[in-house]
A protein has these predicted regions:
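A compositional/biophysical signature of low hydrophobicity enriched in polar/charged and small residues
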Residues: 1-137
């Protein structure tokens, strides 16, 4: 329950968290500290409106490679528009979630992906509309 409350609004005070789950603020603070210590809570972040920042195009890029692409994480992470990168089982080696300001910038990003050692091809799926995004609780 604490995790769900923090996912909804990580700025809530320990007093508010404690009240919501029937604990004192000190006990809520201690539980959150333990969750961080155990690695359950890895970081505290914000939810940014990407369109407001000029990143209106969201796409998923399937990356094919002729080597183990799991070793390419640092190179892919160096491309600022790459939001997520996952080694996958299926029709490609890696799945990227990317955000760019437009089609030209998406094409520029794909050129950068092709410069990563071992990349032999890509398939890109452009998002037309996001129905919802959520973090599972």
């Amino acid at each position: 329950m604490l995790i769900g409350l923090l996912q909804d609004d990580a700025t809530r005070s320990y007093a508010m968290l404690g009240k919501a789950v029937g604990l004192s603020s000190g006990a809520a603070h201690e539980r959150v500290r333990k969750l961080r210590e155990r690695g359950v809570i890895r970081r505290t972040t914000i939810d940014v409106d990407q369109e407001a920042l000029g990143r209106a195009v969201t796409a998923y890029v399937l990356v094919d490679g002729n080597t183990w692409m799991g070793d390419s994480g640092d190179r892919l992470a160096a491309i600022p528009e790459v939001e997520e990168a996952h080694v996958i089982a299926g029709p490609a080696s890696v799945l990227l979630k990317v955000r760019t300001s437009g089609p030209k910038e998406l094409q520029d990003l794909l050129r950068q992906v092709f410069q990563v050692d071992g990349v032999t091809g890509t398939q890109t799926v452009v998002v037309l509309q996001t129905l919802f995004e959520r973090t599972l609780k």
